[in-house]
UniProtKB/Swiss-Prot annotation:
Domain of life: Bacteria
Keywords of the record: Ribonucleoprotein, Ribosomal protein
Coiled-coil regions listed: none
Gene3D superfamilies per record: 2.40.50.100
Name of the protein this chain belongs to: Large ribosomal subunit protein bL27
Keyword Ribosomal protein: yes
Species name: Burkholderia mallei (strain ATCC 23344)
GO molecular function, one term: structural constituent of ribosome
Name of the gene: rpmA
Length: 87
């Protein structure tokens, strides 16, 4: 009688799916209008010129151009700007 004893149960074995947050287009790279620049939780980075913010705080380009990351003010807030491409 070749029986196998029942395996014990484990309280592990779960993990949440990654949310794929972070910078999608880096400084100096070209981007088209509507392109996602940063996916984030909260305003870790703020929208500057030619950058819009979605309801989930995603930053996206409003015009075609190049991405530029800057820091502003005494608090050194990170701001994302899109420099428009020469028409």
């Amino acid at each position: 009688m070749a029986h196998k004893k029942a395996g014990g149960s484990s309280r592990n074995g779960r993990d949440s799916e990654s949310k794929r947050l972070g910078v999608k287009v880096y400084g100096g790279q070209a981007i088209n209008a509507g392109g996602i620049i940063v996916r984030q939780r909260g305003t870790r980075m703020h929208a500057g010129e030619n950058v819009g913010m979605g309801k989930d705080h995603t930053l996206f380009a409003l015009v075609d151009g190049h991405v530029k990351f800057t820091t502003k003010g005494a608090a050194k807030k990170h701001t994302v700007v899109v420099v428009p491409a020469a028409a």
